[in-house]
Curated annotation (Swiss-Prot):
Catalyzes the conversion of dethiobiotin (DTB) to biotin by the insertion of a sulfur atom into dethiobiotin via a radical-based mechanism. Its cofactor is [4Fe-4S] cluster; [2Fe-2S] cluster. It catalyses: (4R,5S)-dethiobiotin + (sulfur carrier)-SH + 2 reduced [2Fe-2S]-[ferredoxin] + 2 S-adenosyl-L-methionine = (sulfur carrier)-H + biotin + 2 5'-deoxyadenosine + 2 L-methionine + 2 oxidized [2Fe-2S]-[ferredoxin]. NCBIfam families: bioB. This is Biotin synthase. Homodimer. SUPFAM superfamilies: Radical SAM enzymes. It comes from the Bacteria. SMART domains: BATS, Elp3. Pathway: Cofactor biosynthesis; biotin biosynthesis; biotin from 7,8-diaminononanoate: step 2/2. It comes from Nitrobacter winogradskyi (strain ATCC 25391 / DSM 10237 / CIP 104748 / NCIMB 11846 / Nb-255). Residues 53-272 form the Radical SAM core domain. Its EC number is 2.8.1.6.
């Protein structure tokens, strides 16, 4: 049964202001709206708050890989699974800074530093704060994902120059325990609160395609949209195949239309948030990515690798955005010479 499109009349104007009281029925009604109407609504809201022809870019570096004590069932960096990832020590600041310089030269406006920890130790946080200050001095936006934080740790990160803290909720509260047992959803919410109270912007989203139902995907969006403040960035990750992890047994990557619907609903429910196409873009055709941009996605990660998984080449991204007539920090990236016809 198809739902009637959600109207934009004066009694239910989705564009009036961000809401924090979304219901399951409203989310399901949006999701099942006829596809052309859903994209029209999402694009209308997108145009109210963003340049619809611009895409932000960010780069992600694993500054400490593997050996994580958490048992996230999708993650190659968990010490619980044999995913072929070798644990490393925390990188030196100079190496991180050089990578950030290259990312900036390649067109990244934001540099994200990720460490596979349950929570950072204070001695490690000292070094991370030095990295953040150095990257900030390059003129880039800074982001970090380091696990759970105390209020004091969040404050220190903010004082070091951190702009965004990434801490995903991963999935719906109902599906969460099927994926992770060593960290609760409440743990995640408390870390988000610590980051927000310290004055950090939030980057918070999740993963789709782990075996969850559509209702779980919508439940994740409802959770995010009903926070006191919407995350400034909402990354939508498409499940990446990772050997040796339990999610392989349940994974069911959504069909392209389902992904576009998810992006559109995220845009409508969180109208001022940047919606990022994150991990999994290597599985998307150019046409699918274009539809996601129409639905309201307006950010991508660039670089050949995201932590331990593959990502489209930056030149491919630049070429796609050029074909679509969309602007981005990649505009200055040199295109490969065209093949002779």
């Amino acid at each position: 049964m198809k739902s009637d499109p959600v109207s934009f009349d004066s009694s239910h104007d989705l564009m009036a202001r961000p809401r924090h009281d979304w219901t399951r029925v409203e989310a399901e009604t949006l999701y099942t709206t006829p596809f052309p109407d859903l994209l029209f609504q999402a694009q209308t809201i997108h145009r109210r708050h963003f340049d619809p022809n611009h895409v932000e870019t960010a780069s992600l570096l694993s500054i400490k890989t593997g050996g994580c004590p958490e048992d996230c069932g999708y993650c190659a960096q968990s010490a619980h699974y044999d995913a072929g990832v070798k644990a490393t020590k925390l990188m030196d600041k100079d190496a991180v800074l050089e990578t950030a310089r290259r990312a900036k030269d390649a067109g990244a406006g934001r540099f994200c530093m990720a460490a596979a920890w349950r929570h950072p130790k204070d001695r490690d946080l000292d070094r991370v704060c030095d990295m953040i200050s150095a990257v900030k001095a390059l003129g880039m936006e800074t982001c970090a994902t380091l696990g759970m934080l105390t209020p004091e740790q969040a404050r220190r990160l903010q004082e070091a120059g951190l702009d965004f803290y990434n801490h995903n909720v991963d999935t719906s509260p109902e599906f969460y325990d099927k994926i992770i047992t060593t960290r609760t959803m409440q743990d995640r919410i408390e870390t988000l609160a610590c980051a927000r109270e310290a004055g950090l912007k939030l980057c918070c989203g999740g993963i789709i395609g782990m075996g969850e139902q559509v209702g779980d995907r919508l439940g994740m969006l409802i959770l995010l949209a009903n926070l006191d403040e919407h995350p400034e960035s909402v990354p939508i990750n498409l499940w990446n195949e990772v050997r040796g992890v339990p999610v392989n047994d349940t994974a069911d990557r959504p069909d392209p239309i389902a992904l576009v619907r998810m992006i559109a609903v995220a845009r409508i429910m969180m109208p001022k948030s940047v919606v990022r196409l994150s991990a999994g873009r290597q599985y998307m055709t150019d046409e699918l990515q274009a539809l996601c941009f129409v639905a309201g996605a307006n950010s991508i990660f660039i670089g050949d690798v995201l932590l331990t998984t593959k990502n489209p080449a930056t030149l491919r991204d630049a070429a796609l955005l050029d074909r679509l007539g969309m602007s981005s920090p990649l505009d200055g990236v040199k295109m490969p010479a065209a093949s002779p016809s």
